Each structure stands twice: as C-alpha cells, then as structure tokens.
Amino acid sequence: MELTHFDEEGRARMVDVSAKAETTRVATARGKVEMQAETLERIRSGQIAKGDVLAVAQVAGIMAAKQTSNVIPMCHPLAITGAKLNFEIVPPGTIEIEGIVKVTGKTGVEMEALTAVSVAALTIYDMCKAIDKTMVISDIRLMEKTGGKSGHFIREDHLKSTT
C-alpha cells in the first residue's frame, strides 16, 4: 500500500484531492475513559467542581472535530456537515465515548471523528484530574467509515455491537 502523504523524494505533502468526486462521508470512532467508581458517581450526580463534565466534553469534542486540520498537519480543512458525541456510562468506572462526523466532500472524516473522541476524553480527564489522577484514556479507534473510493470499512467489534 502506498503512503500518499510523501512525495517522490520522501518529503511530506498534503494530498491533492481536487480530482476526487464529492460524496457523503461518515466516520464513527470510539474510545473510553476508565476511572475510580467514586469519580464516575460524582460525574453522574453533578458533583464535579468544574461543572457538567459530559456537557463540556461533548462541546469540546465537536469543537475539536471542526479544528482537526489545525492540529493534524496533513489533514484537509473540511466543512463538516454534522458532528455528534455520545457517552455511555458503564459502572463501576468507565465512560465510553462515540463520535460520529459527517461531511459531503472529497476526503473522509476519520481523523475528525478520532480527534473528537480524543479531545472529549481529554476534557473528561481535565475536569476530573483534581479528584482522580489514576484515570486511563484508552481504545481510541475508528469503528466505521462510509463514502469515498476506498468504500465501506467496519470494525468487526462494531458490527457485533450494532446487531
């Protein structure tokens, strides 16, 4: 498989997508934050001094999706048409994060979905670190993507979780 972010001399470049067709593209990413059970209970009950952790993480993730090209060097700036973050509380101490990003464009939104989940997780960590420095952010991964020349990708464990 060819790495397209390098030219013939091995120098970095942003891929030219001008000849690609505009299609609807959707990407779903997931990750999780593991914490002490007491921390999760304080998030659930609104007992975190910095505010509503999941509401702030949701906004942070959406904002991050829109800014992905500013932090990932070879990412194209995209006019995202939709971004959504979902959180699932899994006792005793896990928050699972799902990010779904959509665009009609010439390149996919995988990096935007991954960035949304990553920043949402980092926001949860930031807002709770005063009471729990043992939190672990993990398993950030692309679950599914549709649209574009490379077609439909679906991670096997995502297929199992949606059936």
Curated annotation (Swiss-Prot):
Residues at the active site: 126
Pfam families documented for this protein: MoaC
EC number(s) from the headed UniProt entry: 4.6.1.17
UniProt record, GO biological process: Mo-molybdopterin cofactor biosynthetic process
Binding locations of substrate: 74-76, 111-112
Keywords assigned by UniProt, alphabetized: Lyase, Molybdenum cofactor biosynthesis
Gene3D superfamilies attached to this UniProt entry: Molybdopterin cofactor biosynthesis C (MoaC) domain
Pathway participation: Cofactor biosynthesis; molybdopterin biosynthesis
Catalysed transformations (reactions): (8S)-3',8-cyclo-7,8-dihydroguanosine 5'-triphosphate = cyclic pyranopterin phosphate + diphosphate
GO molecular function: cyclic pyranopterin monophosphate synthase activity
Family, per entry: Belongs to the MoaC family.
Quaternary structure note: Homohexamer; trimer of dimers.
HAMAP family the UniProt entry points to: MoaC_B
Its biological purpose: Catalyzes the conversion of (8S)-3',8-cyclo-7,8-dihydroguanosine 5'-triphosphate to cyclic pyranopterin monophosphate (cPMP).
Protein name as it appears in the record: Cyclic pyranopterin monophosphate synthase
Organism: Desulfitobacterium hafniense (strain DSM 10664 / DCB-2)
Lineage: Bacteria, Bacillati, Bacillota, Clostridia, Eubacteriales
